Amino acid sequence: MLPANQPSTDYNLKVNPEKFQSLEDARCFLLKQVKEWDNPQNKTTPENSGVVRLEASLESAHPLEWLTLQDCSQKIYWENRSQKEQFAGIGTALEIADGKDGYENILQVISKILKDSPETVRFYGGMRFDSKASISPEWETWGTARFTIPLVELSIIEENVTLACNFLPDDKKNSKLQPLQNLLESLRTEDVIIPDNPLIGLERHDLPEYRQWCRLVEQ
């Protein structure tokens, strides 16, 4: 699962001025911001139609450990090889799926959304190498392509730690901010205790195997 973003003008971005000491403090800050945004007396509107993103900077956090705590059926996680970039997300603020009309079309839609959104907004997902190949049962719901922006995201880039939430400008008038508020209210922020002897995988099966994967990439 790969993240995708691109530079843009941050019309829709709001960030806390200083770093929070705990995830709980960051959670409370974001919840307050979302409630203020959802207040009928608040007439603030973004300057474009892109994603609205609220961010809270943190001193430290562990995205994967945080993700294991969350009671949410929609979860994503990605990190680079050096582990200097880690992203964990829950819920779905926006999803673009299928791609039967062609991968170029779906990528154009994603590019337009990112252009109108803060540069820290990212889609997570991917697409099949061969859209015409048969699909195994466990991947049928995925379709040919699927990209998601999570509702709530915890990320580390180099040493910058951020808890953020994403939503669309129309979510306010369509009463779609309540699910985000519910998610923030139920967000678990306590520390995770990692066992000294984690489970060890006994078997590994790669499909496709490495050589076949290389051939697919080169096609």
Tell where the protein language model's regions lie, with residue ranges.
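Signature of the chorismate-utilizing enzyme
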Residues: M1-Q219
